[in-house]
A protein has these predicted regions:
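Short beta-strand scaffold segments in enzyme catalytic cores
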Residues: 87-89, 101-104, 140, 239-241, ...
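Cys-nucleophile CN-hydrolase/nitrilase-fold catalytic domain and related Cys-dependent amidase chemistry
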Residues: 17, 26-108, 114, 180-207
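CN hydrolase (nitrilase-like) catalytic-core segments centered on the catalytic cysteine
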Residues: 66-86, 154-258
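A conserved C-terminal secondary-structure "cap"
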Residues: 267-290
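Active-site catalytic loop in hydrolytic enzyme cores
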Residues: 63-66, 76, 93-178, 182-200, ...
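Short, glycine-anchored, charge-dense loop/turn motifs used at functional sites
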Residues: 6, 104-112, 242-249
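N-terminal active-site segment of His-dependent metallophosphoesterases
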Residues: 1-38, 175
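Short glycine/proline- and charge-enriched loop/turn segments
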Residues: 53-61, 123-124, 224-230
């Protein structure tokens, strides 16, 4: 029996980087005290979601791994608490390329590696192509102290190729740091669709999925640098954990800060995957290159 307890934290983000990092650390510490061993913060939690507007000066937010405040703070916290923390951050990579990345920090405080967001959205007030180069790491599985995990980032979660790619690499649990909320043009609530998409991924790959989203309304202040844009996004939280069949076993509401956690037996999950034969019966030679 290999039991692991996983958690997702949910919080609002202010314009104060230090305040956001301290808030995330406080929630991670509380989750660890409750027994969590792998703890997921939301996407780009250092700041408010700056991709809502286009400003050239925001490129300066990107830092190399070794210089990012959130990563360095979480490395120390992971070592202190003996927990795994996948940390989303704005990365200044090689060749002056800028990436939306996750550093997977193991329970000894060391970075196991980086995943760079593969699928980059470009929509009203989710203008990520302005800031991020599409990731070049490919889908990865990270062997942490407690489990082998896969990490996708927000828009990645809408693509079944992301999940299957991580599953084929050996992932046992899938983690998605997220920043998603109101649709500024479409008059719809995308939350149920967002959640169903990932519960389906869990069911089709027979492995738990964890999604951590932010909450709160974030407003853009009109100025010359953003062309006098005036807008706002309300992030709908609803962070959740599924079991291997896609059943939501833990969830949060749309407005509350805090964390959720759940325990799984990894040996039992592996046995269940084998008994269903989903990976045995794959026919990749029939799927084509596209």
């Amino acid at each position: 029996m290999r039991e692991v307890t996983i958690a997702a934290i949910q919080m609002s983000c202010s314009r104060d980087v230090k305040e956001n990092i301290e808030k995330a650390a406080k929630l991670i510490r509380a989750a660890a005290e409750a027994g969590a061993q792998i703890i997921l913060p939301s996407e780009l939690f250092e700041r408010q979601y700056f991709c809502q507007e286009r400003r050239y000066d925001y490129y300066d937010y990107a830092k190399p791994l070794s210089e990012n405040d959130a990563v360095q703070s979480m490395k120390a916290l992971a070592k202190e608490l003996g927990v795994v923390i996948p940390v989303s951050f704005y990365e200044a990579g090689e060749g002056r390329q800028l990436f939306n990345s996750v550093a997977v920090i193991d329970a000894d405080g060391e970075v196991l590696g980086i995943y760079r967001k593969t699928h980059i959205p470009d929509d009203h007030y989710y203008q990520e192509k302005f800031y991020f180069t599409p990731g070049n790491t490919g889908f990865k599985a990270f062997k942490t102290r407690y489990a082998t995990i896969g990490v996708g980032i927000c828009w990645d979660q809408w693509f079944p190729e992301t999940v299957r790619g991580m599953a084929l690499k050996g992932a046992e649990i899938l983690f998605y740091p997220t920043a998603i909320g109101s649709e500024p043009i479409l008059e719809c609530d995308s939350m149920p669709h967002w959640r169903r998409c990932m519960t389906g991924h869990a069911a089709c790959n027979l492995m738990p999925v964890v999604a951590a989203n932010r909450i709160g309304t974030e407003e853009v202040v009109p100025c010359a640098e953003n062309g006098n844009q005036s807008s706002a996004l309300t992030f709908y939280g609803s962070s959740f954990i599924t079991d291997a069949t896609g059943e939501v076993v833990e969830q949060m509401d749309r407005v509350t800060e805090g964390f959720i956690l759940h325990s799984f037996d990894l040996d039992e999950l592996e046995s269940e995957r084998k008994s269903w034969g989903l990976f045995r019966d794959r026919r990749p030679e029939m799927y084509g290159e596209n």
